Each structure stands twice: as structure tokens, then as C-alpha cells.
Amino acid sequence: MKAILLLAIFSVLTVAICGVSQNYGNVRYNYTELPNGEYCYIPRRRCVTTEQCCKPYDTVNNFAACGMAWPEDKKRKVNKCYICDNELTLCTR
């Protein structure tokens, strides 16, 4: 019983000291219709140009891009939509 109590106290102290990490991958984006009648491509979807990708709501701190990435089959690189943070240089994948 004493070991369980010590483990619980240690866990609480660890969380209090280290904190909970933020998930920067969840940037909200504006799902809108494009001029050609299609809807914009969500992050991680294949794209040809950046104009096809959904733009973030916060355009001051974030931007959308179409960049190269390895697909799941890892045969060749493909273009995928990303939303990136200007300051942290983190992109959703």
C-alpha cells in the first residue's frame, strides 16, 4: 500500500514539474470552396499547388503549403498539403 501511495505522489509531482506538452499539429484551417468548384485539400492530402490547400484561420502565425513527403508505400516522394507555424517551423502531417 505504501508503494502505491509513493508511486501516485511521484506521478503527480512529475506531471506538475514537467507539465503537459502542447500538440502543435492541430492547427485549425478554413475548409472553403475553390474557384473551380472543388473544396480545398485538407492537410496530408496530395496536392499539386499551394492554392489547392486549405488556409489556416490564423494567417498571421500560420501558413499553408504544398510540399514533398514520403507516402506510406515509400516508393517515391509526393506533394502533400501542410499547415505550418511561422515561429516554430512545425507543420501538420
Swiss-Prot record:
Gene Ontology CC: one annotated term: extracellular region
Signal peptide stretch: 1-18
Gene Ontology terms, MF aspect: ion channel regulator activity; toxin activity
This protein's UniProt keywords: Disulfide bond, Ion channel impairing toxin, Knottin, Neurotoxin, Secreted, Signal, Toxin
Location(s) in or outside the cell: Secreted
Recorded superkingdom: Eukaryota
Cysteines paired by S-S bonds: 40-54, 40-81, 53-66, 84-91
Tissue: Expressed by the venom gland.
Principal localisation: secreted
Name of one Pfam family that matches: Cys_Knot_tox
InterPro entries xrefs: Cys_Knot_tox
Domain comment (free text): The presence of a 'disulfide through disulfide knot' structurally defines this protein as a knottin.
Function: Probable neurotoxin with ion channel impairing activity.
Family: Belongs to the neurotoxin 27 (Jztx-72) family. ICK-72 subfamily.
Protein name: U8-theraphotoxin-Hs1b
Native source organism of the sequence: Cyriopagopus schmidti
